[in-house]
Amino acid sequence: MIERIWSGCSLLWVLLLPLSWLYGLISGAIRLSYQLGLRKAWRAPVPVVVVGNLTAGGNGKTPVVVWLVEQLQQRGIRAGVVSRGYGGKAAHYPLVLNDATTPAEAGDEPVLIYQRTGAPVAVSANRAEAVQALMGHATPQIIITDDGLQHYALARDKEIVVVDGVRRFGNGWWLPAGPMRERASRLKQVDAVITNGGEARSGEIAMQLNPGLAVNLRSGEKRPVNTLNNVVAMAGIGHPPRFFATLEKCGLTPVKTVSLADHQALREADVLALLSEGQSLLMTEKDAVKCRAFAHDNWWYLPVDATLAQPQADQLLKDILTLVR
């Protein structure tokens, strides 16, 4: 229903306009207070690059963070990551992740980033506190924030916005009548716009999410996704249809698709209830980090990697490297 409202296919968005005006007024006032110096942003001792979005959920932001961290690591740069940790509830904050940290504590995306990159990761609603905890735990040369474009309490040196190239900005209204956290005009003020799928517009960097081999959660076995049989596909991400469309492009038509809420907690019994005898389960990598502790032999996940268009991607990296060197 919310997708229909935000896409303009339902007139219910009109009823939500008063709340959207209030949201826009408050968010605009907060940003203006930092611009006018009425509030002071905390500046980290190392450069900060924000990877965020203008809309709520499902734009491909986390794969961009993973790509950026890996690119920096390949160039000998120690990158750290801070995140809000949506979906997690830790005993205390800030929380610096380690090998024993669970998605229930830190959230699924921070755990995914930590496992994929090995980079130090800290979570807190207060990003400045997360950075300070990270600096006390490791020696990063640069901080990448997973989300946080609207968290103006943390000063930043570069801003990168990830846009869903197919859905773009829906009906263009602020939350909750539309998907917008800020107006689309904000794109003119950021350092780079990365467009996930669809058609990149002038000045934007085109990106595709390329699937790898399906990975078994228990054994680590890898195989082409189209060799799996009798598959139930499960996606608890911001925009599940993108995952299901990816499977179709890979030559796999699931017997059933299951869309879950983004960051939804998962229990073994609930997941098993999705399957009938003889069926296999295929999920996103973000869901896999929540299911690994109780995975069964016939559970698989499909990792994706961000591929950015050249030469724009190299230029973006060069611009970021100038902050460090």
Swiss-Prot record:
Its GO CC terms are: plasma membrane
Q: Where does ATP bind?
A: 55-62
E.C. numbers: 2.7.1.130
Catalysed transformations (reactions): a lipid A disaccharide + ATP = a lipid IVA + ADP + H(+)
Q: Which Gene Ontology MF annotations are present?
A: ATP binding; tetraacyldisaccharide 4'-kinase activity
Q: Which Pfam families match?
A: LpxK
- Single biological process term from Gene Ontology: lipopolysaccharide core region biosynthetic process
UniProt keyword terms in alphabetical order = ATP-binding, Kinase, Lipid A biosynthesis, Lipid biosynthesis, Lipid metabolism, Nucleotide-binding, Transferase
* The family this protein is said to belong to: Belongs to the LpxK family.
Q: What does this protein do?
A: Transfers the gamma-phosphate of ATP to the 4'-position of a tetraacyldisaccharide 1-phosphate intermediate (termed DS-1-P) to form tetraacyldisaccharide 1,4'-bis-phosphate (lipid IVA).
Specify the protein name.
Tetraacyldisaccharide 4'-kinase
Tell me the organism.
Cronobacter sakazakii (strain ATCC BAA-894)
Question: What's the gene?
Answer: lpxK
